[in-house]
Swiss-Prot record:
Belongs to the RecF family. This is DNA replication and repair protein RecF. ATP binds at residues 30-37. The RecF protein is involved in DNA metabolism; it is required for DNA replication and normal SOS inducibility. RecF binds preferentially to single-stranded, linear DNA. It also seems to bind ATP. It holds the Pfam family SMC_N. GO terms for cellular component: cytoplasm. It is found in: Cytoplasm. It comes from Desulforudis audaxviator (strain MP104C). One of its GO terms (molecular function) is single-stranded DNA binding. Keywords: ATP-binding, Cytoplasm, DNA damage, DNA repair, DNA replication, DNA-binding, Nucleotide-binding, SOS response. The gene is recF. GO terms for biological process: DNA replication; DNA synthesis involved in DNA repair; double-strand break repair; SOS response. Its main location: cytoplasm.
Amino acid sequence: MRLTRIKAGNFRNFQHLDVQPAAGLNIVRGRNAQGKTNFIEAVFFALRGHSFRSLRDRELVTWGQESAFVEAELEGKDGRTRVRAELNPAGKKIVWAGEPVGKAELAVRLGTVLFTPDDLSLIKGGPRERRRFLDLELGIFVPGYLTALQLYRRALEQRNHLLRMGGGRRYSELLDLWTDEVCKYGMMLLSGRLEILKEFAPLACRLFGAWAGEELAVRYRSSVGLSNGVRTPGAGDLRETLAAVRQDEIRAGQTQAGPHLDDLAFMVNGKEGRPFASQGQQRSVVLALKLAQVFLWKRHTGEAPVVLLDDLLFEFDRERRDKVLETLQNDVQVFITTGERVLSGSRVFCVHSGNIQEES
């Protein structure tokens, strides 16, 4: 899949945006605070239906304006299509191929891989960041995963509410009911995570080794005591764990085992990346994770996603940067933001004060 045209009106500092990018490498250059990241955000918003920088859609609308839109024209193996996202005081409306859709459907249908400085939180941050990556970036490749995730969160909320109430026969019956639901959907999530990691982890480790000449290992840390797909987990595994900690849960008012507490560990040369890896190693690990997603998209859909790299590629040395670009050369459309530097073989767009023009 590739983006053939991106248009926007009153989006951030772009009052009017109309760009026809190259099918391959696109460089978006300009000084700081001119709109480079806003351009990447516009593309991402069109393809995903939400921002990667702001939780409030209203912040995306140009100051003093009431509404905004972003529209993307796309070309893929099934032909041409269009997606349009509109923001106004009444809310957000997304239309894809003439039909209203939600952002969850866009995430599954329109391949997008984003790498920004904030993604270093996959290594530096807490377990929640890594679970979010598992659920929203990798879970889309497992049939039924996102539905199971919604049902698990609902069951978990109900169970936690009961744990905080305490007491009575009716309470005990309801707690057992929601415990069954938590176990059922929780083990669906765990099975799905282990399944996709068996495919994803070798890709990321191979990419990291090719660029860095070092060893990367990915470890799944489960609160149920299962890891790395040793065997297929079942609902009974989680049920036994929850039974063992029931009194602790009642005192705490929280479910104390399940995929909502699990974590990933990234081991660089046998040592955990979060406390021991250098800044450069951490950056290389995250880039390997992101580009492994590109291969997953191609493997599962037969099409490459649109790749968005916000400023970070130029923080690598030239040899490693060339290896990354070589990896992406085959049928992958890439957008890279930078201050001034330009790569040969690319289409270059210059951003200045919310205006963007192609350089000849």
